[in-house]
């Protein structure tokens, strides 16, 4: 039995295909979803989406949103998303280093919050790449 997974951003469809299982980062932690999962609607955190096809796992960096799960259908609407295989490792590492530097230079509450969010997004992109190679 399979699940139909659809990952959408406001601009495009990132993924629309059948999968065996997913592991999703929510605001209350990670959840695993298998066929016949109980219906749920949840907020999606900045984090990694792991997708199992057959014996192969793929990763995707999600930048926050929400998910609806029910009747073996999973719809994830996020601000932005990238497949781990589409992320340039050098660019992601460079973005992470810039985000770390910006956080150390942040002045005031607003700059600190924005720098922390940028750092979380950058770390998620690097984690999506590293999860592929492990």
Swiss-Prot record:
Q: Which GO terms describe its molecular function?
A: ATP binding; proton-transporting ATP synthase activity, rotational mechanism
Transcription: present as a keyword of the record?
A: no
Q: Which UniProt keywords apply?
A: ATP synthesis, CF(1), Chloroplast, Hydrogen ion transport, Ion transport, Membrane, Plastid, Thylakoid, Transport
Top-level taxon in the UniProt lineage: Eukaryota
List the membrane topology term(s).
Peripheral membrane protein
Give the UniProt subcellular location, in the record's own words. Plastid, Chloroplast thylakoid membrane
Q: What's any GO biological process attached to this entry?
A: proton motive force-driven ATP synthesis
Could you confirm whether the keyword Ion transport appears in this record? yes
Give the principal location in a single coarse category: plastid
Extract the InterPro entries matched here: ATP_synth_F1_dsu/esu, ATP_synth_F1_dsu/esu_N, ATP_synth_F1_esu_C, ATPsynth_dsu/esu_N
Question: For this UniProt entry, which segments traverse the membrane?
Answer: none
Cellular component GO terms held in the UniProt record: chloroplast thylakoid membrane; proton-transporting ATP synthase complex
Q: Which CDD domains match?
A: F1-ATPase_delta
Q: What does this protein do?
A: Produces ATP from ADP in the presence of a proton gradient across the membrane.
Q: Which NCBIfam families match?
A: ATP_synt_epsi
Similarity section: Belongs to the ATPase epsilon chain family.
Q: How does it assemble?
A: F-type ATPases have 2 components, CF(1) - the catalytic core - and CF(0) - the membrane proton channel. CF(1) has five subunits: alpha(3), beta(3), gamma(1), delta(1), epsilon(1). CF(0) has three main subunits: a, b and c.
Q: What is this protein called?
A: ATP synthase epsilon chain, chloroplastic
Species of origin reads Amborella trichopoda
């Amino acid at each position: 039995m399979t699940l139909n997974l659809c990952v959408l951003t406001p601009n495009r469809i990132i993924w629309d295909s059948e999968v065996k299982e997913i592991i999703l980062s929510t605001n209350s932690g990670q959840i695993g979803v298998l066929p016949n999962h109980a219906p749920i609607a949840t907020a999606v955190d900045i984090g990694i989406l792991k997708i199992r096809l057959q014996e192969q796992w793929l990763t995707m960096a999600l930048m926050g949103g929400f998910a609806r799960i029910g009747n073996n259908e999973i719809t994830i609407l996020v601000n932005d998303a990238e497949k781990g295989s589409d992320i340039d490792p050098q660019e992601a590492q460079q973005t992470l280093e810039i985000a770390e530097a910006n956080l150390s230079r942040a002045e005031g509450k607003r700059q600190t919050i924005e720098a922390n969010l940028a750092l979380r997004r950058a770390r998620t992109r690097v984690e999506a790449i590293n999860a592929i190679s492990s």
